Amino acid sequence: MHLGDLTHPNELHGLKLSELEDVARQIRDRHLQVVSTSGGHLGPGLGVVELTLALYQTLDLDRDRVIWDVGHQAYPHKLITGRFNDFHTLRQQNGVAGYLKRSESNFDHFGAGHASTSISAALGMAMARDNRGEDFKCVAVIGDGALTGGMALEAINHAGHLPETPLLVVLNDNDMSISPPVGALSNVLNRARLSPPMQFLSGSVEESVRHLPFMGGELPAELNRLKGSMRRLAVPKVGAVFEELGFTYMGPIDGHDIGEMMRTFQAAHRDGGPVLVHVVTKKGKGYPYAEADQVGYHAQSAFDLTTGKAIPSKKPKPASYSKVFGQTLVKLCEQNSRVVGITAAMATGTGLDLLQKAVPNQYVDVGIAEQHAVTLAAGMACEGLRPVVAIYSTFLQRAYDQLIHDVGIQNLPVTFVLDRAGIVGADGPTHQGQYDISYMRSIPNFTVMAPKDEAELQRMLVTCLNHDGPTALRIPRGSGVGMPLMEEGWEALPIGRGELLREGDDLLIVAYGSMVHPALDTATLLEEAGLSTTVINARFLRPLDQALIHPLARRIRRVVTMEEGALAGGFGAAVLESLSDQDISIPLLRIGIPDKMVDHATPQQSKESLEMIPVQMAERIRRRFDLGGRDFAGAASVPAIQS
């Protein structure tokens, strides 16, 4: 069977084991071909190919529900549920999404992008099924990294108290989330994985026996019986944890043995309550480079399949904001032993991997546990440390109560670095950092800021650590603008003071963070059309520099705000409210992300669709204030703006 001809996943039912192994090969080939060309998540999907096929052999996918945690391990699922021929559009505008979307396929039963949600969703579906007297299977597939998240453990605790509610949880145990998972539960799983019985089951012994000249490639029945006995020796160490929580535990089993998994899943379906099947897989299975470097090949930009090396960009790029942050924090930690960097399982993504290598005793990884990370930092601050918590903007949403209750109310000197703030591109709506301006500006005691470039980032980090109260610093995804960087000796900025970058009489632009340089480009376009423009780098959201903004607004009488975040409750709203509070009633245009979810595309494509690139913003300004003159949109290569 060729997967391009598959019209429904149930058509895989009844295939021989050898035929399923051929399907697995096709899945891996297509997966590697597409991700090596366009980028995407590589290791997670390669590790669950056989798991996916074995599980789906035991389900009726017209009726049964499968919830994939996070979604980055679901590429094989997509390839056998109608998206094989369109898979080359992965993570591209209007193409196949990198995560699960209910709107994309009837087989995507629950959308995802953040970790640890699958068991809660599957349990909710199972309870709804029982409430309606229906009969279908509910399955959650979750990785060992996501299982460290508190939400997953809360769901397990709940499900364990419902002994007559059938629910299957498949634990995909590859000892990796993005970085290696941390915590006591991960240690329990790791001890089971590394125990002599499981090492025996790892496949090396089996391969050795299979290649004995007198075996003819076959395995004796005695070896299979011995494998079963050895597995039972490993069960008490890990299975007891889940059994005590009310689950029937099955495993650990080889996550690349389709036949064994099919038999186990069928047995699990016959159980009348919650069951956890523990499957041990290898992240990156089938691609040697990904197997050898499971962190580096978790997600990849385009790369050469033969060498495994990333395809270099056509021209060198400045260092990323994340890297500049990481390098600067290393220096600050070396200078001050009270400074501690904290990550929630995203060391490489946030730049804290540099701190882990350079000053490991001032580095903490809490796993996928954002709420814990925030309150842990609060406790450290109470005892005189200066914690710096680096978390993606989209993931800090999960700890909003802790920001208020544990840090804000107590006015503790904790610094938050919100990475991937703004438009992130191909990861789509679950990962856009569009809400942090809105959710941070309402918390009393916080000082909130955003740099216009990587050099200002360095000064802002020092500003945060010098301030005796909670601070938040947002940085965008990707490279800086190429500003020269200092190795040390950074000066703190005055709190609440903006920066006047250029002066003019016709228009005032107040820009925040990553929108400052686009604002300057927009001002240049307007200047060429005869419109003299003042540009302010706001620097601070809380407190806003009213002493700089208000007099200029009164004089110029036309104001534009620019932000790479949601307009609802955002930076523009803060400026508008500030002017209104002082009875400054003037025309104001807010440019940012409107009230909508931003789908997957390149950052440039997303910004074009939101009318946030300079030529579009110049045209919006011209029309909003009826300034006449040049039609910027008509002269641009981008679609004209509809008035």
Swiss-Prot record:
Q: In which pathway does it act?
A: Metabolic intermediate biosynthesis; 1-deoxy-D-xylulose 5-phosphate biosynthesis; 1-deoxy-D-xylulose 5-phosphate from D-glyceraldehyde 3-phosphate and pyruvate: step 1/1
Catalytic class of the enzyme: transferase
One function term, GO molecular function aspect = thiamine pyrophosphate binding
Q: PANTHER family attached here? A: 1-D-DEOXYXYLULOSE 5-PHOSPHATE SYNTHASE-RELATED, 1-DEOXY-D-XYLULOSE-5-PHOSPHATE SYNTHASE, CHLOROPLASTIC
What HAMAP family does the record tag this protein with?
A: DXP_synth
Summarizing the function annotation, the protein's role is:
Catalyzes the acyloin condensation reaction between C atoms 2 and 3 of pyruvate and glyceraldehyde 3-phosphate to yield 1-deoxy-D-xylulose-5-phosphate (DXP).
Protein name stated in the entry: 1-deoxy-D-xylulose-5-phosphate synthase
Q: Which organism is it from?
A: Parasynechococcus marenigrum (strain WH8102)
